[in-house]
Amino acid sequence: MFSGSMVALITPLGEAGEVDYASLANLVEYHIAAGTDAIVAVGTSGESATLTVDEHVKVVLKTLEYAKGRIQVLAGTGANATHEAIIFSKLFSGTGVAGCLTVTPYYNKPTQEGLYQHYKAIAEATDLPQLLYNVPGRTAVDLLPETVARLAKFENIVGIKDATGDLSRVKKTRELCGEDFIQLSGDDATGLDFVAQGGHGVISVTANIAAADMATMFKLALSGQFEAAQKINARLMPLHRDLFVESNPIPVKWAAHQLGLIKHGYLRLPLTELSESAHPVVLQALKDANVLL
């Protein structure tokens, strides 16, 4: 259902802070041409936390419109209030969205039982396929494999994006949830190793600016050609590292602008533009990865 190189798509913004839909359309075409397996719109990299509800919905629907059925589009639907996450999931039902990526509630720090009840309520309220999203470095809660196993019993909870960087979880989650439960890495630096451990792919920040390389790398990996995949991964490692020199998506939006993929690299407060001292760091990473010659 979901596998390979899936991009955690950035949301282009204009000088006044408005969504730049022309650049968004360009990004969709870029990913289709590059062979990206799926687009995840309005997740962390898409600045979901600072878009209005209307903007959130419109960006997803416009991404679908631009894709024209040529690539899968998933919607970020996470919220730290369960009823809001349900509303988002229901809004995208019947639109053509392939599934939802739902981050664990942030700030309010629910228990494992609270996390279970949160996702249970969402699963029971919508028929869309749901991907759990565990990123404790941002949310301050960790969705444990045992809780994932309880949730995997719901037919429409089909997998997880795991951004813990803990490769031991791949095997444990597979043992608890079965081989058909989709496991996607949310950490570019360990994404290839994640697949080597039995994962199905990655939801990637790096793919925003190195889409063809990421798509090729994961096609090779999923066909068992890890040596060839590792050569690409080694070249991309400066990006995996330095696209996080400041908070994501600050560096990747700056890089995408430098590459001409988007018209501007603007963000919304409280995120600020990439500091000048970090410009040479990201620029060198682009050169080392052969993305910028």
From Swiss-Prot:
Subcellular location: Cytoplasm
This protein's pathway: Amino-acid biosynthesis; L-lysine biosynthesis via DAP pathway; (S)-tetrahydrodipicolinate from L-aspartate: step 3/4
An annotated GO BP: lysine biosynthetic process via diaminopimelate
Top-level taxon in the UniProt lineage: Bacteria
Site positions per UniProt: Part of a proton relay during catalysis: T44, Y107
Database matches in CDD domains: DHDPS
GO terms of molecular function: 4-hydroxy-tetrahydrodipicolinate synthase activity
Pfam families reported for this sequence: DHDPS
Active site as annotated: Y133, K161
EC numbers for this chain: 4.3.3.7
Recorded GO CC terms: cytosol
Catalytic activity of the protein: L-aspartate 4-semialdehyde + pyruvate = (2S,4S)-4-hydroxy-2,3,4,5-tetrahydrodipicolinate + H2O + H(+)
Broad class of the protein's primary localization: cytoplasm
Protein residues bound to pyruvate: S45, I203
Signal peptide interval: none
Keyword vocabulary terms for this entry: Amino-acid biosynthesis, Cytoplasm, Diaminopimelate biosynthesis, Lyase, Lysine biosynthesis, Schiff base
Entry keyword Cytoplasm: yes
Xref: InterPro entries: Aldolase_TIM, DapA, DapA-like, Schiff_base-form_aldolases_AS
Keyword Amino-acid biosynthesis part of the UniProt annotation: yes
Complexes and interactors: Homotetramer; dimer of dimers.
The protein's role, per its UniProt record: Catalyzes the condensation of (S)-aspartate-beta-semialdehyde [(S)-ASA] and pyruvate to 4-hydroxy-tetrahydrodipicolinate (HTPA).
Protein family according to the UniProt entry: Belongs to the DapA family.
Name listed for the protein in its UniProt record: 4-hydroxy-tetrahydrodipicolinate synthase
Gene assigned in the entry: dapA
